[in-house]
Amino acid sequence: QSRKNKILTYLCLPISILSQMILGSSTATIATIIGAAGVLSVVLFKKWNKEINAYFILCANFVFNALLIFGMTGFLGGIVHALFNKDLTFSNRTIAWGKAVTNILQRPITGTGILTSDEMKSVLGSLSFNQAHNEWLQCLWQGGIILFVILVLLLITIAGKINRIQHRKLRFMCCMFFISVFIEMAFEVWLGLV
């Protein structure tokens, strides 16, 4: 059974990564690679002493998003260009981010509520954008600080549950998936339109 699971893992992981590469999504490719690294760590290593605190991952995610959204382009520019051969507009996502922030400031406590795809495109000023392309901005935009706090509390609860996992390899794998989700959330609306 264990050997069969390993073989299945070795077959599925490259297919998962290659499928994201074929689709051309840099964000999904990186997130999938990180998730795959978590799975491989469980499969390959018999002894595992690595510890990652899920609360640290959550805090690092907030810092990363703040730097990303509020313009640390000088710091991130070289890294993004070297890794993904993309400019720092992240396929023009920074335009959507700026317009989302403007809309958040209009109704910061309760947000605007759910907008239709056409309304989103109109507000964001592009036919190709029907969301803010950042989960945190989308959450603040549609549900305001109230929904943002609810989402943060949910993620704190998840981080606590991950940290309480006794099996170290499983805890590490869950942390890697937590990171994968946050990478997706930085550039897409991963949880869907709230």
What are these regions (language model features)?
Residues Q1, M21-T29, T89, E135-C139:
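Membrane-interface segments at transmembrane-helix junctions in multi-pass inner-membrane proteins
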Residues S2-I7, S41-I52, R164-R168:
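Membrane-interface junctions at the ends of membrane-embedded or membrane-associated helices
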Residues R3-N5, G143-F182:
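Hydrophobic transmembrane alpha-helices and their immediate junctions
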Residues K4-C12, T27-A31, N53-A60, F172-M176:
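Alpha-helical transmembrane segments of integral membrane proteins
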Residues Y10-S41, G143-L147, V189-V194:
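Helix-loop-helix junctions and helix-breaking kinks within/between transmembrane helices
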Residues I15-M21, V63-I69, F178-F187:
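Aromatic-anchored segments of alpha-helical transmembrane domains
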Residues Q20-L23, L40-N85, V101-Q106:
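A membrane-periplasm/extracellular boundary helix in multi-pass inner-membrane enzymes
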Residues V80-G143:
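Long extracytoplasmic/lumenal interhelical loops at the membrane interface
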